[in-house]
Amino acid sequence: MYFNNELSDQKVCLLRELKNLKYSDDARDRINFFLWELKFLDCFLHLKSFPFASECGMLHVSQKMIDIWKSHCSKTINGTILYYGKVPLNLFVNWKKVIWKTKQEFRAQYSFPKTPLAANKVIDDDDNTHSPKFVMEVIDVFVENLNVLMKINDPCSWFFVPGHMKEQIEQVLKELKLLRFFVCFVSNKCSIQPQYRCTTFYTHALIEASHIAMVVWLHLPIYGNVNQDLAPSEVSRLFSDFMEMKIKSIQPVISRNNIYIDVLQALKSTIPQAQKKHAAESSTVEIPTHSLTVGLSDQMANLQEMLCLLRDNLIHLPILDLEFHLQDMDSVIIDAGLLIYSLYDIKREKEDTVLDDMNRALGLDLPRNIEPIKVMVYLVMQKAIQCNLPKVHGLGYVDFLLKNLKDFQGRYSDSLAFLKNQLQVIQTEFESLQPFLKVVVEEPQNKLKTLNEDCAIQIIRKAHEVEYVVDACINKGIPHWCLERWLQDIIEEITCIKAKIQEKNTVDDTMKTVIARTSSKLARTPRMNEEIVGFKDVIENLRNQLLNGTKGQDVISIHGMPGLGKTTLANRLYSDRSVVSHFDICAQCCVSQVYSYKDLLLALLCDAIGEGSVRRELHANELADMLRKTLLPRRYLILVDDVWENSVWDDLRGCFPDANNRSRIILTTRHHEVAKYASVHSDPLHLRMFDEDESWKLLEKKVFGEQSCSPLLKKVGLRIAKMCGQLPLSIVLVAGILSEMEKEVECWEQVANDLGTHIRSNSRAIVDQSYHVLPCHLKSCFLYFGAFLGVREIRISRLIRLWISESFIKSCEGRRLEDIAEGYLENLIGRNLVMVTQRANSNGKVKACRLHDVLLNFCKERAAEENLLLWINRDQSTKAVYSHKQHAHLAFTKMDNLVEWSASSSLVGSVLIMRYNPYFARCPLYAVSHILLNFKFLKVLDLKHQVVIDFIPTELPYLRYLTADIGQNSIPSSISNLWNLETLILNRRSVVHKILLPSTVWDMVKLRFLFIPNFSPENKKALLKNSPNLDDLETLSYPYFARVKDAELMLRKTPNLRKLTCKVKCLEYLHQYHALNFPIRLEILKLYRSNAFKAIPFCISAPNLKYLKLSGFYLDSQYLSKTADHLKNLEVLKLYYVEFGDHREWKVSNGMFPQLKILKLEDVSLMKWIVADDAFPNLEQLVLRGCQDLMEIPSCFMDILSLQYIEVEDCNESVVKSAMNIQETQVEDYQNTNFKLVLIEVHY
């Protein structure tokens, strides 16, 4: 809508005067009020061509108001501003009085127009002001102006309207919006040439909207209006009467065969093809639904329920799916409208008419008329769920569903009673398909791979639907008739899937042997310390720059396109033994495109001084100062990987002091400008492409390992290597494909043909191909990495817990889910899709990994396409979220506020806060706890990054994974409502006070991982007597044991623990060395003392323990000797802050630690260490830190043939000397070329 020319000129003049002036909030309020009045007047003037505007006085009052403005107000206002040079507070007061007086004069005279509609027709001609669009624009202006009154709550504002009147305005707004939606619906469905009935309806709509706007304008707002002819209560009553008599769109001016019936009948006769967006469609359903509420809600409740369901689900349909059903929906909406308006017409004539009388009068069979609406409602609801399901998912979802079906039928037997038979059939059907799903996982490369995977995905999608139906039944969100029909359709579809499987003989031929067979495809042998291929000349030159060159600090910048191997090359140099031994400190960080300055500093400090010494609560500038002081006296090597901008180097370089001691920094970047900007002495290195020989050697190495390729394969292999464009990333990805295939020429030729046409022109093509050949059980695991954008390293323990909670891991009888998940990961590593960044020293298991940026971005984009993952940025608008499929199975966010998009995500399965945000550190995110209740299907909630919640959401029955910071010292007993929970990680900012754990936690029998710092059971007697065992619990962290009995009790309740971290206090059995029997499967034990005592009150008995850490205790040789008798499988022993008794002496006898591989002593008060020759026969690593009282390392370490590594830091000279003697003996006498000695001198 545009202003009338006269008004527009005056408005422009006024705004020009106000533009450069300063004015108060009160003045601004009055200016806005003035503009609000002008906007109403402009609309009324636009209606001057219609007879009804003159008849009711609308045109007359509007024109008079304009004359008043031109003759009095405009000159007064402009003159005042010119004179005073500012906006006085009373500027509009006099003019406002004039306006109100004029309104009073016309209020009593104004009446609803009686001119026949035919005389007021809106004609859709060349004049755009006479069209349905014009009607909607008029309504939009009225709605916008009325919304202003709804938003103002300040009683001093000129716009203020009391609350009881706001309720009336709110109802007016609702009616205007419904009327506007109906106009939109009719105009969208009309044929190109407008029909008489439609144009009559447009006029009717325009008259109604204009009339209500005039009434509102004449009476509101009332603030500051003295000598009113109506009191506020009378104005309120006027609105009530008006609402009853005039505005209801269901009450037409023409009774019987009214406008609404006429226009709907006209549309029904010629329903056109779908044209417009689905948003208008869902809103249009509101019209007959609302009419039902007003007129016949007592007799038409079922119809009302169906139309509400239709409205609520339309918004969740993608455009393409909606347009497919649009014509049918048009028919349903029109039929519903005709039915309702016809029934209302009869009832209005005769108030006591019953439903049967109406049916006879109209010749209707109401149940039969409602049936098509039922069908459409069901189809739309079903489609709204199906079209938003993930296109890929883990095959473990059926396992989760089957467990839940049993639990739900037990917990909600009354609600599910009417579906009991169908649910039992579905459960039986899914159980019968379990062997087939095992085949899909264990034989991914058989000849029926594509068919099997298609069927598997269909099965998983049906499992999702069953879950939704069961939940809807329990929560009474969908009528029973719809649920029964849905489950019956699911049963029939599962039957069809089974028939398809059996038709192709996949069940009969392969299921018989699947249980007895373990596939080698699930896992691979870990590849340790792989030698880098290629770039030998480059490595030698860079090594020389690192070890020699300028005496001052130097930056070695490596730049080049993605996939060249910059990071691999830099890491190769960073871990080179000759390089590492040259520097006192080595530290690295990965920047990426999105980074946190504090995270970078923490990463560097953890490498420089050890993770345990880093104070994470410090601010970034404090951490930077700590890093600078740590590096200053030493020669250091820093690796800064993947720098995108000069500003990153500006942030970091102040932390790297130049002590003129040949310190070096390796920097990798894609951009030459960044490399040049960071360079100091050495010129940036532009990393070249591989040559043909290097390309082939890398491909051969990745496919065959230490073996060589046959001559027949080499010919086609050389061609494939050349096709990769001399890009190392492409080569290793293709090698990952080839390594999964038979070593046959035909297979390799097929790969060459698949790659040949597009790999050179599209770098993503090879990634697409690598993804395409993945087995379906690995696709979701791989795409899940897209959630970790900007993460330097991904901890495997966390990744695997998330995979399990997401149902990506298919269970296998006799195997732990964690072990299966590790097999999946090794498979992805073997395909060169995942890079290992850290392995455990003792057993070689992967501890951390990362993806190349190219692969990471692919995962993010493809996961969005597959509706698996939706990454939402904090500044992303709600509209952008709605543009995606609203029910992506996973949602990841960096937003401060979940409110804006939570309403569209009720079916989301996961919410993860993936990056630190200062907002979260400043204050609790109170909204989160309440908003999370909207995510009723939530299975994973990871609020790890300093999101403090004010209470634990316990109404999420599907939740399997919860990580958050909490503010309270106790946990509610209602936490047991989270009966599906498997991982529970709750942190507190302060751990001074113990957290009380309710006894109901022990009812959560599915728990596998429990981490709560410094917790203590609330009711120990209840724990002993009433609670079940937590048989699935494998990791328990930070219980506080005040007595040995408490520890014994908890250990009895957790018989299958594998990892335990705890604090102990009690002094019982101090001199008796009472043996505390830990669970038989326990492999990792970390014990910390409380501040109250030093001695360990028990002897540790754990026959399968492999890792033991003791911190802060008083120990003696006798205690350690007795403990060692029960720990014959111990591989790692770490003693921190330990005080040795017996004159600070430790005697280790023969055979005491027969399997020990790693021994670490840090800040221990040990002076004399006596070790028998055969005490550590398999020791590989010895680390001594802060052992300043130790006299020397026993000489028997010279003869330990398995020894590979000794690290000495902050110890006296005699210890350093003995370490060097051991090195000499190991290397020169025993030719132990793998032995490495690291000496770190601490400067204060």
From Swiss-Prot:
Disulfide bonds: none annotated. It is found in: Cytoplasm; Membrane. ATP binds at G560, M561, P562, G563, L564, G565, K566, T567. This is Putative late blight resistance protein homolog R1A-4. The keyword Electron transport does not apply. Belongs to the disease resistance NB-LRR family. The lineage of its organism: Eukaryota, Viridiplantae, Streptophyta, Embryophyta, Tracheophyta. The gene is R1A-4. Residues 411-434, 526-548 form a coiled coil. InterPro entries: Apaf_helical (IPR042197), Disease_R_plants (IPR044974), LRR_dom_sf (IPR032675), NB-ARC (IPR002182), P-loop_NTPase (IPR027417), R1A-like_N (IPR021929), RX-like_CC (IPR038005), WH-like_DNA-bd_sf (IPR036388). This protein is encoded by the haplotype A genome of the allohexaploid Solanum demissum. Keywords: ATP-binding, Coiled coil, Cytoplasm, Hypersensitive response, Leucine-rich repeat, Membrane, Nucleotide-binding, Plant defense, Repeat.
